Design a protein with these regions (language model features):
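N-proximal low-complexity "stem/linker" segments adjacent to membrane-targeting elements
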Residues: 1-57, 62
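C-terminal catalytic/acceptor-binding lobe
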Residues: 2-15, 158-215
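Alpha-helical elements of Rossmann-like donor-binding domains used by nucleotide-donor carbohydrate transfer enzymes
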Residues: 35-38, 66, 95, 181
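Anion (oxyanion) recognition and catalysis
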Residues: 44, 97, 187
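Active-site nucleotide-sugar/metal-binding loop of Leloir-type enzymes
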Residues: 65-78
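Conserved catalytic core of nucleotide-sugar-dependent glycosyltransferases
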Residues: 68, 89-167
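Short beta-strand-to-loop acidic/aromatic patch adjacent to the donor-nucleotide binding site
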Residues: 76-87
Length: 215
């Protein structure tokens, strides 16, 4: 196992195989590309067997299903979901792995006003979003976006396909995304969905903004 400044005793116990899964369109943000290269380098130098899979398509449900199958093919222990419009520290995977939890994610801001985050403690109440505030302990939520989420691959073992679905909420006349639906299935199986609020402070959500005369 390669030694580096990023090495830790936790990696000496058992080599870990990590698949980084990224659903994309035709292009990715340059800031994301830079963060990703630094993350892969840092994670690999820590002795973790690191794989990177992209799926460039137009149907997000298909992308996520195919990416999980790629992770299974290489027999990953963990998967790190990243969206291609995110910025994150090079140590992101290491810091999430250190928790040794089934599901641990980062909270981050949505890309539209009113400014809210993507994590909720109660999926029946859209006002229950979790503010970006650092806490000493991991916090439990009912739902969070998958822009930066680490999962043990074996959490999928008890699930039936399709893993990812959209569902319509009649009461609020809107949709649950594939992220919230997956996490609900896993919560129903007894898994906790946890947020690293300290790491979340370093996560950015990229958007293209058009400057014009009104600015």
């Amino acid at each position: 196992m390669k030694k580096s400044l990023n090495n830790s005793s936790m990696w000496d116990v058992k080599p870990i195989k990590l698949s980084i899964l990224v659903p994309t369109r035709d292009t990715v943000h340059s800031h994301f590309a830079y963060c990703l290269t630094q993350l892969v380098r840092t994670t690999s130098e820590a002795g973790i067997d690191t794989y990177l899979f992209f799926d460039s398509n137009t149907i997000l449900l298909n992308q996520r299903e195919k990416l999980i199958e790629k992770a299974k093919e290489v027999r990953s222990d963990y998967v790190l979901w990243l969206d291609s419009d995110m910025m994150f520290p090079s140590t992101t995977a290491l810091r999430l792995l250190e928790h040794n939890k089934d599901i641990v994610a980062c909270n981050y801001m949505k890309r539209a006003k009113p400014l809210k985050t993507v994590a909720y403690t109660d999926l029946t109440n859209w006002d229950s979003w979790v503010p970006l505030e650092p806490k000493d302990e991991l916090i439990k939520v009912e739902g969070v976006g998958m822009g930066c989420m680490l999962m043990k691959l074996n959490t999928f073992d008890k699930l039936q396909k399709p893993y990812f679905e959209f569902t319509y909420k009649e009461d609020s006349q809107d949709w649950y995304g594939e992220d919230f639906n997956l996490l609900k299935k896993l919560r129903d199986l007894g898994y906790d969905v946890l947020i690293d609020t300290i790491l979340s402070m370093d996560i950015k959500h990229l958007v293209i903004y058009a400057f014009g005369s009104e600015n």
